Amino acid sequence: MSPQTETKAKVGFQAGVKDYKLTYYT
């Protein structure tokens, strides 16, 4: 896996977690 893909996946994961928390706790 290239560093670019890894970073994109990490950012996407963090955004997904933030989105999940917002949806779950609101």
Swiss-Prot record:
Keywords: Acetylation, Calvin cycle, Carbon dioxide fixation, Chloroplast, Lyase, Monooxygenase, Oxidoreductase, Photorespiration, Photosynthesis, Plastid. Belongs to the RuBisCO large chain family. Type I subfamily. Heterohexadecamer of 8 large chains and 8 small chains. GO terms for cellular component: chloroplast. It is found in: Plastid, Chloroplast. The keyword Manganese does not apply. RuBisCO catalyzes two reactions: the carboxylation of D-ribulose 1,5-bisphosphate, the primary event in carbon dioxide fixation, as well as the oxidative fragmentation of the pentose substrate in the photorespiration process. Both reactions occur simultaneously and in competition at the same active site. One of its GO terms (molecular function) is monooxygenase activity. It catalyses: 2 (2R)-3-phosphoglycerate + 2 H(+) = D-ribulose 1,5-bisphosphate + CO2 + H2O; D-ribulose 1,5-bisphosphate + O2 = 2-phosphoglycolate + (2R)-3-phosphoglycerate + 2 H(+). The modification N-acetylproline is found at P3. Residues 1-2 form a propeptide. The keyword Acetylation applies. It comes from Vicia faba. This is Ribulose bisphosphate carboxylase large chain. Its EC number is 4.1.1.39. One of its GO terms (biological process) is reductive pentose-phosphate cycle. Signal peptide: none annotated. The basic functional RuBisCO is composed of a large chain homodimer in a 'head-to-tail' conformation. In form I RuBisCO this homodimer is arranged in a barrel-like tetramer with the small subunits forming a tetrameric 'cap' on each end of the 'barrel'.
